[in-house]
Amino acid sequence: MQKVNDYMINSMQFLYLVASYLFGNILTAYIVTKWRHNVDIRDEGSGNPGARNMGRVYGKGYFVATFLGDAIKGAIVVSIAKYLFEDFTFVMLTLLAVIMGHIYPMLFKGKGGKGISTFIGGLIAFDYLIALTLVAVFIIFYLIFKGFTKPGLITIACLPLCMILYSYSIVTTILSALIIVLILYVNHE
């Protein structure tokens, strides 16, 4: 049985969590629309600075660019954490931090994206086998529901089960469940 001290974080980890949150504040949609059109995407379409709104307002190319930018952001945070700290529980905590930074960015007064792209990129970097398993789950639900939103949210909700199936610790699994609750909450609003 692990001791409570095993889950304490040191000052370097704390600084990395803060940096992860701040890195999450970089909103690809905002940067792209400011650069290309000199507008704030939060004033366009649904007002959400995410890939889906970019696709609706500016087309598929903007959707792809925004998705990739936000996904890479999550992947960078998780990849560096895996390299530096080698603790899956802490790495999952960094994924939560970057997603929190994306959804509730301090730089944008708490009005960010919905976190799905950042989550996907971070999850692929965390464990590509879990990501592939969830892709298979998504395909099954996509064939049943013939849409993206419902199958996507159902698939995301399956993450904690995958964490258990792939033998991650209970604490890491609980952190993954917190991420899912956050994403489902934000996407329900």
Swiss-Prot record:
Membrane-spanning ranges: 12-32, 61-81, 88-108, 124-144, 164-184
GO molecular function: acyl-phosphate glycerol-3-phosphate acyltransferase activity
Bilayer topology: Multi-pass membrane protein
Catalytically driven reaction(s): an acyl phosphate + sn-glycerol 3-phosphate = a 1-acyl-sn-glycero-3-phosphate + phosphate
UniProt keyword terms in alphabetical order: Cell membrane, Lipid biosynthesis, Lipid metabolism, Membrane, Phospholipid biosynthesis, Phospholipid metabolism, Transferase, Transmembrane, Transmembrane helix
Superkingdom in the source lineage: Bacteria
Family matches, as Pfam families: G3P_acyltransf
Pathway membership: Lipid metabolism; phospholipid metabolism
Keyword Flavoprotein in record: no
Gene Ontology biological-process annotations: phospholipid biosynthetic process
Enzyme Commission code(s) on record: 2.3.1.275
Predominant subcellular localization, coarse grouping: membrane
InterPro entries from the UniProt entry: G3P_acylTferase_PlsY (IPR003811)
UniProt subcellular location: Cell membrane
Family label: Belongs to the PlsY family.
NCBIfam families from the UniProt entry: PRK00220.2-1
PANTHER family, alphabetized: GLYCEROL-3-PHOSPHATE ACYLTRANSFERASE-RELATED, INNER MEMBRANE PROTEIN YGIH
Subunit-structure text: Probably interacts with PlsX.
Function: Catalyzes the transfer of an acyl group from acyl-phosphate (acyl-PO(4)) to glycerol-3-phosphate (G3P) to form lysophosphatidic acid (LPA). This enzyme utilizes acyl-phosphate as fatty acyl donor, but not acyl-CoA or acyl-ACP.
Name of the featured protein: Glycerol-3-phosphate acyltransferase 1
Phylogenetic placement of the source organism: Bacteria, Bacillati, Bacillota, Bacilli, Bacillales
Gene: plsY1
